[in-house]
Amino acid sequence: MYQRILWKFALTAIVLLWATLNLIPFKETEFKDYLRQEATAQRDELLKLIDRAAQRVQEKKAASVFVALKQIGHEERIDMSKFFPEVRLESSLRNIEKRNDILFEYLLKESKPRLQLGLDLKGGVAFTLEASSLEVAGQQQTVHELKLDKAVEIIGTRVNALGVAEPIIRPVGTNRIEVQLPGVSTKDNPEVISVLRKPAVLTFHLVHPQYAFMPEPLPLAALPPGYVNMSTDSDDASGRPVTTYCAVKRIPEMDGENIVDSRPTVDMYGGYEILLRFNDVGAKKFADVTGANVGRLLGIVLDGKLYSAPRINDRIGGGSAQITGRFTQREALELSNVLNNPLKVKLDVVEQYEVGKSLGEDAIMSAKTAFLISTALTILFILVFYTFGGVIAAVGMGCNVFVILGVMAMPGVEATLTMPGIAGIVLTLAMSVDANILIFERMKEELATGKSLTAALEAGFEKAWSAILDSNVTTLLTAIIMWALGKGAVKGFGVTLTIGIFTTMFAAMIVSKLLLQVAILPGYMKRLPMFSVLQNTRYDFLKFGRAAFIASWTIVFIGVGVVAFKGKGIFGIDFVGGDQVTIAFQQPIDVGQLRSAATQGTGVREATFAYQTQLGSGTQVLKCTTEFEKGGVVVEAIQKAFPQAGFTNAGVNSIGPSVGSEILKSALISVALALLGIMLYVAFRFEFGYGMGAVIATIHDLLMTIGIFVLFDRQFNASMVAAILLIIGYSINDTIVVFDRIREELAGNPEGSLRDILNRALNLTLARTVITGGTTLLTSITLIVVTTGDVNDIAFTLLIGVLTGTFSSLFIACPVFYWWHKGDRRHVEAHRDIAPKYEWEGASKASN
């Protein structure tokens, strides 16, 4: 017996330990304290250096201990890695400054919690970039010709490549871009801005054969006509940086316009270089340039800096080239990133702030309370129906959320936790209880036939397995499509949903089964009390199918009509932009209180506040983002509500959307392909009529949810993209459970008519439908009552989705399946082999 559960126990322990290791450390340690903890060699010397660095910060000679230590190491050529011998650096890296950079970045990252908080919970850094014309290959190009929107898209791609999740990037006015990065501090990472604003203009120049790698630049009078001085850096044998100079032809032989890919690679000496790959046009140009200049040095210049000048030994016709230089791994990755996403405008930093969290303490506390209450209500709800089984479901929920957080924190994922993200996890947990409910309801049916508790346990898991598998696979198809094709929030939702599917399966089929087996198999538990509800019902659901179908689609068309009538009015600031007001103040007020004052009785539907501290001067201002032409209204409202604060309007800017059209487009494409994937999978696993029913029901639920959301005069913002997509998962999950039971009843009941089979399947799954919906409704209603803002909108969306999903499973999906087959089970059997299977023919053994 114990051998049957030993592997489950071992797997559970390994997964939970792995999740724990991913989440450690749980709290941030101040950098200087972390260095004291981790240093294992020459500690006394390091402690003195830390004290000196702290003194520099106190004297305002450095922004942080992190920066001060790097300065000291550079000035005095101290290799800081000697204090941390356990940290392995690149073996080929001899330059002390770069070794210290890599070491300190690693230690800084290790000092922070694995799971980072978003802008709403912790804040971050914000800066404004101003675009101006840029000279490329001798031609002046203007900002208007190149469009600011493209620059916003490119910066977004670069931010994603840096591993920063949930950023805000949007145009401000006609020539500025605002970037907000959660969990980032320019005090510790000042290079982040330069990486994002680097144009990445790559050009190839011939080097004068007589004036290459000189110790000093040529005097201007001695420069050959058409040539300019450029410097390049290298290291000598001791690791000291050495600068040499080349006379480089001013006009490039070709540029990097035709590069289709760049990526870092390791050379034969263990150093890093960048491999470039050209398209056909670029490959021909490069072959022509190298073929015509065999024996010459070809300088590779990026943003006016000469990185390398290799000699052309032969014509290069392979369509690729390498940039060699003194690259660290990080530098190679960053350069590859910017080369893959080149900017064609010059970006200058005009403002730089540390940003406070956008949610006030009161809002955060009320949201935390709501999450705790909703989770407690969900557990209580399950305990009422399943007693000890509810305890097991609650333990499974705990394991589920712990593993989800562990996956989010793992290297390579490193997701940022925001308040809407927490709401999504809480709601996902409420929905994930469905697997346990399916198992318990099946066990209840088996116990009613007189089976022992042990036999009911095995049969319950076996019979629930197909429904759990198919419902999760269809949802997984949706998630993978969003992950692969989506952008921004859509891609992020696809990743999160994929994680949730696997953790839910693990919690239900491994953890819950393990706990039940430990309690039942040794005989500790003789009975499993479960409260029965909606048992032996005989409702004729198909009787109301036509009327329900017409009524619900009428509501859908009304909702779609309202959406069409309102047009862009259904979108919030994230999608259409708005006003950004800079407000000076004398006394800070909690941003939650400011939001309430700005939106109550003023006609303002949306207002977001955040305190920002300008780096350098330390000046603090309040930034408010609201709808177009509402900035003045907001300022008047908060001035009236808080006269003691001394609020004054310091300026208003128009801001663009933070969610680009590409994200909306990717969401629509992902949904369309997901629906096609669902139909094909269901048709393969069941039959085509099932696929039609599932897709039509899902479309119904999406349109109904959007329509009702708009009818209640709510607006769509970035977090709502994920909430709407979540409805697809819930809707198809509900429908598949019903279809799985229909398939089973058709196979086991050869005499019943198709109408009787459908009604029987709907009645048999009714208790599960109501209990699953009830757990999610409890969570949604609690969040709606207690929270505000995006969390409230997400909860409201799921409330509608649960109600419409339950309705469509009963009155849309099944009637469509019934009408598709013209009410004749022979039509079903002609399209799918569902020959009856009887118990005496040998059912498969329950899996371990």
Task: Describe every region a protein language model picked out.
Residues T12, C399, G406-A409, E445-I555, ...:
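Hydrophobic alpha-helical transmembrane segments of membrane transport and translocation systems
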Residues A430-S471, Q517-Y524, R714-I771, I812, ...:
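Cytosolic juxtamembrane regions of multi-pass inner-membrane proteins
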Residues W18-F31, E38-I312, S661, Y681:
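Non-transmembrane, solvent-exposed regions of membrane trafficking/translocation machinery
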Residues I155, S358-T378, M397-G398, M431, ...:
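Pore- and gate-forming transmembrane helices of large, multi-pass membrane proteins
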Residues Y2-R4, L275, V281-I300, E361-L417, ...:
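Interfacial segments of transmembrane alpha-helices in multi-pass membrane proteins
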Residues G118, L129-E135, T142, D149, ...:
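Extracytoplasmic
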